[in-house]
Amino acid sequence: TLFVVGFGVGPMAFAPLSEIFGRRILYASTLLIAVVFIVPCAVAQNIGTLLVCRLIDGIAFSAPMTLVGGTLADLWRNEERGVPMAAFSSAPFIGPAVGPLVGGFLSDALGWRWLYWIQLCLSAFCWLLITFTVRETYAPTILARRAKQMRKELSSDRYVTEMELDERPLGQRLRIFLLRPFQLLFIEPIVLFISLYMSVLYGLL
């Protein structure tokens, strides 16, 4: 489906962007877009509306899935990361297996539109929770904000971070960050094989 296509394309951009702008802003903005575009799916009167909105939802919903791994790396040290990463890694396998089963019963009982209304409620709750309770976890972004605050409070330009000293234009930095996932995909065999396995898994389910 187009949702799965969007789900596969989105991470190529969102993961690198989180290293420039931070995790929190991407969580909040992409989840908001996803929540908004669930509504047209629920009230769609033609297949075109449904396809376009599902594609946008797939792209937007891929961001949290992509960023959680980085967020866990921000929060736990290498030796403490095993259990959180294992719990997170199981979600992509459990979700596609359980989701169609539950969704099938709900669709028969309430109608297919109610699947989107239920998804809207759950997604809106997650957006509110993340937007208003989750803090920034990416260290360079946190340090940049602290340095900016210290410059303002102390009226001194001596407080800068390594990220701020990077004088490369934003376009050049974006190009490097956005190309990196594709380089890993085609150069690193383990990344390529896992990606092929996951694509077959999602295609079958």
Where are these regions (language model features)?
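A six-helix transmembrane bundle that forms the core substrate pathway of small-molecule transporters
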Residues: 1-205
